[in-house]
A protein has these predicted regions:
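N-terminal prosegments of processed precursors
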Residues: 1-39
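Surface-exposed coil/turn segments at beta-strand junctions on protein surfaces, enriched
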Residues: 31-35, 44-48, 94
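Short, aromatic- and glycine-rich surface loops/edge beta-strands on solvent-exposed regions
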Residues: 40-41, 46-61
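Edge beta-strands of extracellular beta-sandwich domains
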Residues: 60-75
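Fold-level signature of zinc-dependent metallopeptidase catalytic domains
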Residues: 74-134, 144-154, 160, 186-195, ...
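Active-site recognition of the HExxH zinc-binding catalytic motif
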Residues: 124, 217-218
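Active-site-proximal segments of metallohydrolase catalytic domains
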Residues: 139-216
Length: 218
């Protein structure tokens, strides 16, 4: 929740889930301590504001809370300038009025970008076959973002296969064979700098069934 520092008025509010919260339910979490990257997308306030982040447990009780002040005039807020190569796959209008989805390339080398854009087009076609996207397609903008990887494909730890890719995704998350995720959210959002987006689809260059989704994350 973002509130105006002077008046206390609520400026912005969103709910979220994280891979960290899922990890908390694993057996590993009973034995070791870990930290996870996370990113919150919030509008830049026009005046000093305060952001409150509350983490709830499985019983919907507040388990942790933190507050962070934001001053738009703070000289240490560094802008991230980005001009990624993009291709608009569905353009329904002004991003201020639409839900913007970014499809991010993962495991596609520079020479495979044409393949990525074709795969992204196929992804959109399949997405729009299903509700609510089918009947509400005019409410969405979808853009494909070329984020080239050094290696082709994605990492499979159980096979000893580690690739150098755009957002360092890998299978075997939480030791589940099919679970393909990334822990590197800073890289993911930096790759999208300069374009409007609310939701992210990481399109991995693999034929292996798998993946996952985290509410309001990716």
């Amino acid at each position: 929740t973002m509130t105006d520092k002077a008046t206390g008025d609520t400026l912005y509010r969103m709910s979220f889930c994280t891979l960290f919260q899922e990890w908390q339910a694993t057996e590993e979490a009973t034995r070791v301590r870990k930290s996870f990257e996370n990113v919150f997308l919030v509008p830049m306030p026009a005046a000093p504001a305060e952001i409150t982040v509350q983490l709830y447990d499985f019983h919907e009780n507040v388990a942790a809370s933190l507050k962070h002040p934001v001053d738009p005039k703070d000289i240490l807020i560094r802008p991230v300038d980005g001009k990624p190569q993009t291709r608009m796959l569905l353009n329904s209008g002004d991003s201020k009025e639409k839900i913007d989805i970014a499809i991010l390339a993962e495991g596609y080398t520079e020479s495979e970008m044409d393949i990525f854009f074709k795969d992204a087009e196929s992804t959109v076609e399949n997405l729009l076959r299903h509700e609510p996207f089918k009947s509400m397609s005019d409410r969405f903008n979808i853009v494909a973002v070329a984020s080239p990887s050094q290696d082709s494909g994605v990492s499979v730890p159980r096979e000893g296969l580690w690739k150098k890719t755009a957002v360092d995704s890998h299978f075997d998350t939480f030791y589940s064979d099919r679970y393909l995720t990334t822990l590197h959210l800073f890289k993911m959002h930096d790759a999208l700098a300069g374009i409007p987006y609310e939701h992210i689809i990481i399109l991995a260059n693999t034929d292996t069934y798998g993946g996952g989704g985290i509410y309001n994350s990716y």
